[in-house]
């Protein structure tokens, strides 16, 4: 018997998930100050397309007492540092291949039109995405619920069939509030495991584990200690009909 995978739609953030960047620039603007103005309401308006690039840099300069030319240079340096995580993107492609093309991949990012144009010029595998949703195009940004609803409506999906991956907890929380499955991108290994859990067939995954552990199907305590006993192996034998190279414990009386 086989069960259907729980989810067939993945939505990824771009920055700090599929792309990395450095806040260290050639200017006098410190990484701390750079991150502060990137989180400002001015920058949020810029990301939604309500401010031009020049106006954004000017207003940021006024608010944070910075030279607009320095702001521009700092952003240019940050753009230059932007690099795709090819290994993780390859992993997504692998999931897509394993699903025989049934897995739909999207991106959803708070990003200005100029910054997105720079990102698209990076040597990344953009073909994995069915569509990329940007705050600049939508006029909305995460964690505003209207942005999530806009995306779900556009891809014609049930929220429960979607896995949303983002590095910011508040963005994931907003997705979960609409019924999506959410993963906080904090540890690559853990995120990979979680994605496989959501998109792979549970029976196939279980059988693959039994094959991998053949001959080593011992019980284990919560402290990581192996317990040599026959009950678990007999239970697996009864349930699957497969011996999995078991080695029974010989009990002498």
Question: What residues fall within each predicted segment?
Answer:
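Active-site neighborhood of HAD-like aspartate-dependent phosphohydrolases
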Residues: 2-40, 44, 48, 54, ...
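Alpha-helix C-cap/termination motif
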Residues: 63, 98-101, 154
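Generic structural signal for small/hydrophobic residues in well-ordered secondary structure
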Residues: 13-16, 49, 95, 107, ...
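Short, basic/glycine-rich phosphate-binding loops at helix/coil junctions
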Residues: 37-39, 59-74, 130-132
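Hydrophobic alpha-helical core bundles mediating ligand binding, dimerization, or RNAP-core interactions
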Residues: 56-61, 75-79, 115-119
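Asp-based, Mg2+/Mn2+-dependent phosphohydrolase catalytic module
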Residues: 1-12, 112-113, 117-205
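Flexible, small-residue-rich N-terminal segments that precede or flank a structured functional core
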Residues: 203-252
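Short, acidic loop-to-helix structural element flanking the phosphoryl-transfer center
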Residues: 6-9, 70-106, 145, 188
């Amino acid at each position: 018997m086989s069960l259907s995978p729980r989810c067939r739609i993945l939505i990824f953030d771009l920055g700090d998930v599929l792309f990395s960047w450095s806040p260290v620039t050639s200017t006098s603007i410190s990484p701390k100050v750079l991150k502060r103005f990137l989180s400002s309401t001015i920058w949020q308006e810029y990301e939604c397309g309500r401010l031009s690039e020049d106006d954004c840099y000017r207003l940021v300069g006024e608010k944070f007492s910075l030279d607009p030319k320095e702001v521009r240079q700092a952003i240019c340096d940050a753009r230059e540092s932007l690099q795709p995580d090819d290994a993780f993107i390859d992993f997504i492609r692998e999931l897509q291949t394993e699903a025989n093309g049934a897995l739909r991949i999207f991106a959803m990012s708070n990003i200005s039109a100029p910054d997105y144009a720079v990102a698209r010029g990076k040597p990344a595998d953009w073909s994995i995405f069915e569509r990329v949703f940007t705050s600049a195009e939508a006029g909305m940004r995460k964690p505003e619920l209207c942005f999530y609803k806009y995306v779900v409506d556009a891809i014609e999906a049930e929220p429960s069939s979607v896995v949303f991956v983002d590095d910011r907890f508040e963005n994931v929380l907003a997705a979960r509030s609409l019924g999506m499955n959410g993963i906080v991108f904090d540890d690559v290994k853990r995120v990979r495991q979680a994605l496989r859990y959501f998109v792979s067939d549970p029976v196939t995954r279980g059988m693959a584990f039994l094959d991998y552990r053949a001959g080593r199907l011992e019980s284990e305590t919560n402290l990581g200690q192996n317990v040599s006993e026959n009950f678990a192996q007999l239970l697996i034998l009864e349930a699957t009909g497969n011996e999995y190279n078991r080695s029974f414990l010989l009990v002498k009386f």
